[in-house]
Structures are given as C-alpha cells and as structure tokens.
Amino acid sequence: MNIALLGFGTVGKAFYELTLGRSDLRVTSVLSRRPRPELPCTVTNDFDEIVRDRSVGIVVEVMGGLEPAYRYICAAMRAGKHVVTANKQLVCAHYDELLELARECGVSLRCTAAAGGGIPWLTSLSRAARLDEITAVGGILNGTTNYMLSAMTTSGVDYTTCLREAQALGYAEADPTADVEGYDARRKLVLSANLAFGASVREEEIPCFGISSVEEKDFAAWRELGRVCKLFVRAERHEGRISAFVCPTLFPAASPVAQTNGTGNLVTLRGARFGELSFFGAGAGGYPTGSSVLSDCVDVIEGCPSFYVSRHEAKHIDNSAVAGRFYLRTGSETVCTGPIIVAEAFARAERALSCGEPVFLARIEEE
C-alpha cells in the first residue's frame, strides 16, 4: 500500500527508513516545506496534491500541533484514505469527532505512537479491554521528565542544568512546557483512559502537576524517606466513576517504578480478572516511535477496525473518592500529609500558588 508521509523530522525520517525494502508498504510522497533531493519519492508542499492522488492508501501524520494537521487528516479521511498519526495533542482535542469521521468514511484511524513511544501500549490496552473489565491504568509515560528526574536523583544536578542537558541530547524540546508541566503525560493518560474504559474524557478536567518547581532540597528529603520521585499518571474506574490525575509520585526506592530510569516508560493496566500487566520500553526517540507508526500501518493493511474501541461514552472526571498521602512543600512549610482526598491536595497547592508561594506537590505511594 502506498503511503503519504506528512512531516520529515526525527520520527518521519525514522519511519521512512523503516519502510525501505518492504514490499507491502511504500512511502511514495512526502509533504515537506523544503525540497528533499535525497528522497527518490515525490516531495511536495501542496497537501491537496496528496488528497487527489488515488494511489495513496495511508496518510501518516507526524507533523505535530493542531493546525494544519487537523485539517489535513480530516481531508485525508474524507478522501477515503486511512490515517496513522503520532499526534496526541490532536487526537485528544478532537477525539469524538475523529472517531466518528473515521467510521463515517469507512477508514482506519490509528495512533499507537501517541502514547508509549516504542511500547505497543494502546494496542495492548485495547485488546485487554476486549477480554476483561479494565479497572485501572497508570505509569510513567513521559521520557523527558523521567530522564530529568533520574539524573537529578543520581547525580544531584539542579533542575535548570538538567533541563539544558536534556535539550542538548534531544530529549527535551526548545519549549519544554508540555513535558515538564505534565501536559504531554496528561494527553497520553486521556487516550489510555478512553481506550481502557470505553470513555471520552476531557483533558482539561484532569488535574495535573508537573516537575518544573522541583528543588534539590526535595530530593534530599526524599532520600531520607527512602523514596524516588517519578512523574506518574493514573486513572481508575469504580462503580461507573472515573478518577484521573497526573502528579509527581514518591515510590519506594527498590520498587520497579523507581528503578525505571532514563527515557524509559513503564505503564500498567489492571483487569478485574487477570490482574496487573506491565509494559516497559523506550518512551521516546525516532526509531521507537517510528516503529509504532509502522506497526499501525501494518495493522491497517491487515484490516484492523476503524479505531481501537467501538464505543466512547462521555465521562466526567471525579476524584472526590480517591485519597492518598502527599508531600507538599510551600514557601512556609514542608509536610507529609495523612490521607487526604486528591482534589484537596491539588487545591492546597493551588491556594499556595495563588499567594505567590513556591510549591511542589507529590503523592506518596503506599508500600
């Protein structure tokens, strides 16, 4: 099947290389803003040319951002072309609409690379959801912050220096906001919760606290507690309600989560009958992400359904019944709370922030 590739950055290049030599999939056109004389295929800056090309069966979108990616993939589906995307921001923002459009047009929409990098997380999660009731998902789903927290834990380097190192290595973007504030991880949690629970949840309803305010004294305090900090996502379903939040979390130093270092991702699902299943792998990088894009393309030519799940019921996030202990540092005190409702923990942090205080919030995982 012929593929049109939208975007030729790190992931786009890796995906292109992974398709070379295959007889079942061929990149025949690339959408690029500049000429690419090194490529033997058609290179164009006119997307309409791709839409009109009836020989193109799959459009692979690795441009990122909301526009023009949204307009492009909608036009591709309306033209009867399957779509594979790594764009978590886009799929989260237009989840219901894109699923319905794929069904109406009789095409496949796949986004495995949008969560988990090289881990086949979304495909594994959707298969598990067909076998059992999934009651919880959670894990480390952002390679940038995991690299930074790992480095700060082991070497004692400060946040600013560590961020610069991550940017120099290509692990962090020039504007790292989406990663360090937890927004990237939250979007991956939205996709995970939607597939696990057959739901449609809104990103803005999920409370989120990132790592940008972490300080060296926090790591010193955690060492005394025998804990290691990870940016962790979690969502649970109980009696029809869905709870979800993103927050730095303190794990016992010997636990598998605490031992997941570098850009690695570790994510777990819990089934009502089969218990917990965990997945570990590279959470970022051209080839790991490109391999997930390629896997989606193979699924398309093998006749996968239009999307991972057949239903998506709108659900509101309800954290009112979820409690835990928290580490809270403000300008005036550092405390480890007793069990409190998650919503109250985030509210305390927000109140301190509104007063202009420096704040760091982390959940303390029970042993």
Regions found by a protein language model. Give the residues of each.
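A conserved regulatory-domain signal marking ACT and ACT-like small-molecule sensing domains
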Residues: 297-299, 303-367
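Oxidoreductase and adenylate-handling cofactor-binding alpha/beta cores
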Residues: 119-134, 145-157, 187-201, 296
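Rossmann-fold NAD(P)-binding glycine/threonine-rich loop
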Residues: 70-75, 88-127
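Rossmann-fold NAD(P) dinucleotide-binding segment
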Residues: 45-86
